[in-house]
Regions:
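Non-catalytic nucleic-acid substrate-recognition regions in nucleic-acid-modifying enzymes
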Residues: 1-2
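Conserved SAM-binding loop of SAM-dependent methyltransferases across substrates and taxa
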Residues: 104-116
Length: 145
């Protein structure tokens, strides 16, 4: 994620490993899943910061490895951010977005950056706080509706 690499095995990834194992072994951190649920991160790079930022196009996000192998972002959603950002930019009218189960705000940030008014909703106060941080990091979106 960004300049750092994280190894996060997933039980849903049932296909064979196609990449060079040497590359996987260079990961800065490795998530080990527990058979009883959850798991823990093993930090192989002792200089790995607790939190860092990554960029996708003109968007910047805070990343922090958490339990259950979460990092604060679902990068596979970037294709969706691109899609609706273009729709928002091409609209001939103001766009209002209701982002439910919004997590740390990847979609919220993308929609705001595209010019939409966004209501961000998540049940976790911590995730809403993180989303607010993502909204204001490296951009002037904090005063947008």
């Amino acid at each position: 994620m960004g300049r750092l690499s994280l190894r996060r095995p997933d039980p849903q990834a049932v296909w064979s490993l196609k990449s060079d194992k040497k590359l996987w072994n260079k990961a800065d951190a490795w998530y080990h899943r527990s058979k009883s649920g959850g798991g823990k991160w093993e930090y192989l790079n002792k200089k790995l910061p607790e939190r860092w930022t990554i960029n996708y196009r003109n968007l910047t996000f805070n990343i922090k490895p958490m339990g259950f192998k979460h990092t604060g972002l679902f990068p596979e959603q970037a294709v969706n951010w691109d899609w609706f950002s273009e729709l928002i930019k091409k609209a001939d009218r103001p766009i209002r977005v209701l982002n439910l189960f919004a997590y740390t705000g990847g979609a919220t940030v993308a929609a705001l950056e595209a010019g939409a008014e966004v209501v961000h909703v998540d049940a976790s106060k911590g995730m809403v706080t993180w989303a607010k941080e993502n909204v204001v990091i490296d951009r002037d979106l904090g005063d947008r509706p």
